[in-house]
Regions:
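Sec-dependent bacterial lipoprotein signal peptides
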Residues: 1-19
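Ser/Thr/Pro/Gly-biased, low-complexity, turn-/loop-rich segments
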Residues: 2-3, 19-260
């Protein structure tokens, strides 16, 4: 009788463990209506090998042509043939952090934001009496972040704004799946030639907002680990949990317990 009772408890414990509900809610430690300060509000700053477009607008069309790179035309293959596509040429920041801008020559832009680059070029054009009324627009061209693991749509995503948060990146990837380990989201960042791995707990708003990787940088890699439920599914024994043979074996065990 005692053996049967012990086996029954072990079976129930196993079933409860295999069917445990993962923690899927975000920010469970935050109170509704309260404001939390976000640390390190970092803007994207360009680096060597980044590519940017710089467009100078003026009332004088001749000046616009002087300071703007030519529009490039490309042929794109399609199922029905080829089509032409036009785009703005860009500046690739060299290893020294410089770009070669028309008339102004070499400009050191590494470490600057889009707004700072635009402001600097505008001031140079005005101070040198080159353009009286310039409007300078700077856009990112090849800056990306990657999101991998347990998300709906993993992939590489373009950065098109000055601040990109971890939540923005996860949203672009379609959010975490139910199998995503929310308490252990990893962000890999390259800093000073070294790769650093940061851990973020999405269940905790305090942890997320205080993280140095709440604001992402170009080339960051976000990895969402699978939770224990998905890990079991990925193993042979885990797959058996959802197989007919497993349930038949379990039924046989329960029958044996009843007979004892």
């Amino acid at each position: 009788m005692k053996i049967r009772y012990i086996l029954f408890l072990l079976t129930v414990a196993f079933l409860l463990g295999s069917c445990a509900t993962p923690k899927v809610a975000y920010f469970t430690d935050l109170k509704r209506g309260t404001a939390e300060q976000v640390l390190n509000p970092l803007e994207i700053r360009v680096r060597p090998e980044d590519k940017i477009s710089i467009l100078v607008n003026s009332k004088d069309p001749l000046l616009m042509n002087l300071f703007n790179l030519p529009i490039i035309s490309r042929q794109i293959g399609t199922t029905s043939g080829t089509s032409n596509s036009q785009g703005i040429s860009g500046y690739t920041i060299n290893k020294d952090g410089d770009i070669d801008f028309p008339v102004l020559g070499h400009i050191h832009v590494a470490g600057m934001t889009r707004e700072e680059i635009a402001s600097y070029i505008k001031e140079e054009l005005v101070s040198k009496n080159l353009v009286k009324d310039p409007v300078v627009t700077v856009e990112f061209m090849n800056l990306t972040v990657s999101v991998l693991g347990e998300v709906a749509n993993p992939g590489r995503f373009n950065i098109d704004k000055d601040k990109l948060t971890l939540l923005d990146a996860l949203s672009m990837a379609g959010d975490l799946t139910v199998y995503g380990k929310r308490e252990n989201v990893l962000v890999q960042r390259e800093e000073n030639g070294k790769k650093t791995l940061y851990q973020v707990n999405l269940n905790s708003g305090y942890d997320l907002y205080a993280s140095p990787v709440y604001y992402l940088q170009q080339n960051d890699i976000v990895y969402v680990e699978p939770n224990s439920m998905k890990a079991r599914q990925a193993t042979v024994n885990g797959n058996n949990v959802r197989s007919a043979s497993f349930w038949m074996s379990l039924a046989s065990l329960l029958t044996t317990i009843t007979v004892l």
